[in-house]
Amino acid sequence: MRHAPCVVMLVHDMSTDRYLIEREYRAGSDMFAYGLPAGLMDEGEDIMDAALRELAEETGVVPDRDTMGVDFVGDFYSSEGMTDELAHIMVLHLGPFRREQRHFDADEHVESAWIPWNDLAATRITSSNSMIAIQHEALRRLIARNSDKDKPSLFS
C-alpha cells in the first residue's frame, strides 16, 4: 500500500520535565489509543517543518526553534510488509513555547495533556512508532541520570 511519509515526535517540556501525550480514536485498531503527536507529511515538505506543523495543528504547541533541542531517532517503516509509509521519529526538547488554536482535520479529534515521565512510562501505548521514541528517551534519561551513579534506574 502506498502511503505518504509521516513524522512522530515525543515532546518534552524541559522547564517542567513533562511529556506531551495524546488520546484519539484510531480507525485501524477501532479504539481510542494513547500515543504521541504525529501526522502525514505534505509532498515536498521538510521533516522538521512537518513535525512543527503537526504539533501546532494537533496540540496548539508552537516551540521556539532557536531554543528547542532535537534528537533525531531515525526513519522506520511502519509496517514494511504492508505499506511503504516511512516514519521520521524524533524527540523534541522544548525551551519556551507558545500556545495557539488547534486545527484538526474534519475526521480528527485529539485530546492532549502534559504528564510526568513515570506516568508516560506506565501508559499503555500500542503504536510501535510512539514506543520507538519513548524507548529512545528512556535510554537518554538512563544515561543522563546515572552517569555518575552505580545503579541505573529508568524511573528517576
Task: Report residues per predicted region.
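Short, surface-exposed secondary-structure junctions/capping segments
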Residues: 12-17, 42, 128-135
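Beta-hairpin (beta-strand-turn-beta-strand) motif
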Residues: 12-14, 24-27, 36-41
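A conserved beta-turn-beta hairpin within the catalytic core of GNAT-like acetyltransferases
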Residues: 27-34, 83
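Glycine/small-residue-rich phosphate/adenosyl-binding loop
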Residues: 19-22
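Acidic, metal-coordinating catalytic segment for phosphate/diphosphate chemistry
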Residues: 1-15
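Short, solvent-exposed aromatic-acidic interface loops
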Residues: 2, 24-28, 106
